Amino acid sequence: MDAQSKEVDALVQKITGLHAAIAKLPSLSPSPDVDALFTDLVTACVPPSPVDVTKLAPEAQAMREGLIRLCSEAEGKLEAHYSDMLAAFDNPLDHLGVFPYYSNYINLSKLEYELLARYVPGGIAPARVAFIGSGPLPFSSYVLAARHLPDTVFDNYVPVRAANDRATRLFRADKDVGARMSFHTADVADLTDELATYDVVFLAALVGMAAEDKGQGDPHLGAHMADGAALVRSAHGARGFLYPIVDPQDIGRGGFEVLAVCHPDDDVVNSVIIAQKSKDMFANGPRNGCGGRYARGTVPVVSPPCRFGEMVADVTQKREEFAKAEVAF
């Protein structure tokens, strides 16, 4: 067995052990035990790795699928907990920093905006944006609206009414961003005419937790969206133990031209896929965001510099802050 295979086997064994420990927890609601295990999991999955999670043995693949479901459940409980905590403030938006991973959303939203601005032909100045899978803490929408798209209206969609009720409370005292935010209880598969009203559609990482489910969302978007851009969050390498991996070819088959794929190797865990729907996008051959051409089937891949050491230090600090916030709450 070569060194790379040994590295992959060791990682899979470690992740399998963490999955077993997480699965035995009596609850995935925020607690020191839950936080410690998920911190260990993220720390194990974030560094660059040669693992291809789509080629795991069936037993490991089943473990991965179960782990992604556990991650989704834990993330939902964590966000609901902090949404309730923030709602206790007179102006919740002044206290978003109490959430341990708020800085990650700032960095991810900045990356997504920069990729859209760089690769979407003609730049990006959307009047209306849909964010599908916003959840009880719609940080991505908020950061984009407050920092990058000050004139844009955001419609946030999630199929759980309780999540929307929580999200709505966070914006009750804000007259700027709050006036540009609305929340709708709906599944992406049920959206048809609405999709034609948006210039950009964001698809969150856990929308359609199985890769095949997420892939099915792309033809639906392609059938109902107006000409414009779609941004899909995915994962790469060992981060595929945390989130579903979306194949850019599936997006292409859904009626989109994939303009760019970004696999960050820093504290931004999600990969980002930029795609564009246009009825005449192939009339003159695919084009990149700078006006040049690239061969059909090839996509520019952008990878920011690795800041893993800083990320580990930040995770440790946030873990301590989380424990303090739990006590205070």
Swiss-Prot record:
Kindly report, in one word, the top-level EC class recorded for this enzyme: transferase
**Per UniProt, what is one Pfam family of this protein?**
NAS
Q: Which InterPro entries match?
A: Nicotian_synth, SAM-dependent_MTases_sf
EC number(s)?
2.5.1.43
Keywords associated with the record: S-adenosyl-L-methionine, Transferase
A GO MF term: nicotianamine synthase activity
Catalytic activity field: 3 S-adenosyl-L-methionine = nicotianamine + 3 S-methyl-5'-thioadenosine + 3 H(+)
Biological process per Gene Ontology, one example term: nicotianamine biosynthetic process
Residues passing through the membrane, by range: none
* Role noted for this protein: Synthesizes nicotianamine, a polyamine that is the first intermediate in the synthesis of the phytosiderophores of the mugineic acid type found in gramineae which serves as a sensor for the physiological iron status within the plant, and/or might be involved in the transport of iron.
Annotated family: Belongs to the nicotianamine synthase (NAS)-like family.
Q: What is this protein called?
A: Probable nicotianamine synthase 7
Species assigned in the record: Hordeum vulgare (Barley)
